[in-house]
Structures are given as structure tokens and as C-alpha cells.
């Protein structure tokens, strides 16, 4: 599946195929899960998905940056950024390896 971008529609179709919900129910389920993740992140909570990874909101302080074209210094305001940290299980699965004696293919 290298090179392909997975969309919400693809996720909904996978739920439809594997779980047996209707297409409308599958789409609603995907939207609900993604919406809840967004709500948690926007309120500053960390989202941890076992065997997948963690989404964390981090604060970045004010700093001085440079316009790469002109070299002029610009003040960059403080902001929140979202960071994804993959689990060791996901890293191993991507790299085709093993983690803690488990095959990367095994579902937990």
C-alpha cells in the first residue's frame, strides 16, 4: 500500500467490510472517533491508542526566527503544536521486525 493516501472514506469502507455495519453507520463511526480525538487534543489532552501511538499537544514558546529569503528577524508567537509518537509495536510493524517477542503482524 506504499504511496497511497488513506482517506476517511477508505477507513469507513474498511469498517463496513470488516465489522459489518452499514456504510452510513461505518462513516458515522469513523467521524465520531476522529471527532473525539480532535476534541480531546483541542482541550489539551493526550490521546494514547494502545499498540498504535500517542497524540500529544505541546506548547512552543515565543522565539526569534528568520525569513529565509531576506534574513530579516521575525518574532514567532507562542503556539500549540500536535505531535504523534508511534508505539514500539507500530514501529516494529512498519519495519517488519519484532517487539518484545511478539510478531509485528500479531494483533493485540
UniProtKB/Swiss-Prot annotation:
- Pfam name, any one: Bac_DNA_binding
UniProt feature coiled coil, ranges: none
Which GO biological process categories is it annotated with? Answer: DNA recombination; positive regulation of metabolic process; regulation of DNA-templated transcription; regulation of translation
Keyword DNA-binding included in the entry's annotation: yes
State the family it belongs to: Belongs to the bacterial histone-like protein family.
Write the record's keywords in alphabetical order, separated by commas.
DNA recombination, DNA-binding, Transcription, Transcription regulation, Translation regulation
Q: Does the keyword Repressor apply?
A: no
Q: Which InterPro entries match?
A: Hist_DNA-bd, Histone-like_DNA-bd_CS, IHF-like_DNA-bd_dom_sf, IHF_alpha
Q: What PANTHER family does UniProt report for this protein, alphabetically? A: DNA-BINDING PROTEIN HU, INTEGRATION HOST FACTOR SUBUNIT ALPHA
Tell me the protein's name: Integration host factor subunit alpha
Protein's organism: Methylorubrum populi (strain ATCC BAA-705 / NCIMB 13946 / BJ001) (Methylobacterium populi)
Which terms in the Gene Ontology molecular function aspect does this entry carry?
Answer: DNA binding; structural constituent of chromatin
Subunit structure as annotated in this protein's UniProt entry: Heterodimer of an alpha and a beta chain.
Encoding gene, per UniProt annotation? ihfA
The protein's role, per its UniProt record: This protein is one of the two subunits of integration host factor, a specific DNA-binding protein that functions in genetic recombination as well as in transcriptional and translational control.
- What does UniProt give as GO cellular component? cytosol
Q: Which CDD domains match?
A: IHF_A (cd13835)
Amino acid at each position: 500500500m506504499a504511496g497511497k493516501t488513506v482517506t476517511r472514506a477508505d477507513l469507513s469502507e474498511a469498517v463496513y467490510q470488516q465489522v459489518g455495519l452499514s456504510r452510513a453507520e461505518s462513516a458515522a463511526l469513523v467521524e465520531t472517533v476522529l471527532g473525539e480525538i480532535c476534541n480531546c487534543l483541542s482541550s489539551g489532552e493526550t490521546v494514547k491508542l494502545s499498540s498504535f501511538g500517542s497524540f500529544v499537544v505541546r506548547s512552543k514558546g515565543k522565539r526569534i526566527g528568520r525569513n529565509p529569503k531576506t534574513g530579516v528577524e521575525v518574532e514567532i508567537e507562542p503556539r500549540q503544536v500536535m505531535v504523534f509518537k508511534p508505539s514500539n509495536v507500530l514501529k516494529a510493524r512498519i519495519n517488519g521486525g519484532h517487539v518484545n517477542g511478539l510478531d509485528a503482524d500479531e494483533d493485540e
